[in-house]
Amino acid sequence: IDGRSVIAKAYPIGIDFDHFTAQGRTGEARQTAQRMLSSTRRRTAMIGVDRLDYSKGLPERLDGISRFFERHPDRVRDLVFIQIAPPSREDIDSYQQIRALLEQKAGQINGAHSSIDLVPVRYVNQGHSPAELYGAFLACKIGLVTPLRDGMNLVAKEYVAAQDPADPGVLILSRFAGAAQQLKGALLVN
């Protein structure tokens, strides 16, 4: 253009790896991981962290968790699912409806599968610091990132970055997340 060369390339967004992994060296991250391991009583923990948004497929995710426990009732004692969904756009009716629906679905799953000493689903409608999320990711052996359609989902990359290389967890990732193009080691689902 006008005697100049122009090159256009795609550069997928990433996380600040050094900054994020530095969070893992904090006392807050270590304490969060220890609290989670203690509170889950060494059950396999699966985590989803998504802002409260219709594109994230959160109702469908809870439907999948419900079907899993219905088909595998013996696994209720082995698995705990933790969904962290910080509120977003709280003044919009459709987002209020999603929150109410998630609370209802989590309650139905827990009502059907809880016992006096365990609750299979923990739904948390609050934000957490990067250090707390690092600790939570480290404590969870399964990361679940299953948006209906998404751009470059950074949570998937944060989950992978928080894993212990000697004993990493598994990332279950929607093929409709932009991160699926880069995270070839993830278990891709539709």
Predicted regions mapped to residue ranges:
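Nucleotide-sugar donor-binding and catalytic loop/hinge architecture
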Residues: D2-S5, Q23-M46, P73-V76
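Carbohydrate-associated surface elements
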Residues: G14
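Conserved donor-binding/catalytic core segment of Leloir-type glycosyltransferases
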Residues: T40-S55, L62, F81-I82
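Conserved donor-binding loops in enzymes that form glycosidic bonds
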Residues: D50-L52, P86, Q126, N190
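Active-site helix-initiating loop/hinge in glycosyltransferases
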Residues: K56-L58, G64, N153
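Catalytic binding pocket for nucleotide-activated donors in carbohydrate/polymer assembly enzymes
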Residues: E70-I82, L138-N190
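Nucleotide-activated donor-binding/catalytic signature segment of Leloir-type glycosyltransferases, i.e.
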Residues: A85-A131
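Short acidic alpha-helix that forms the nucleotide-activated donor recognition element
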Residues: H128-K141
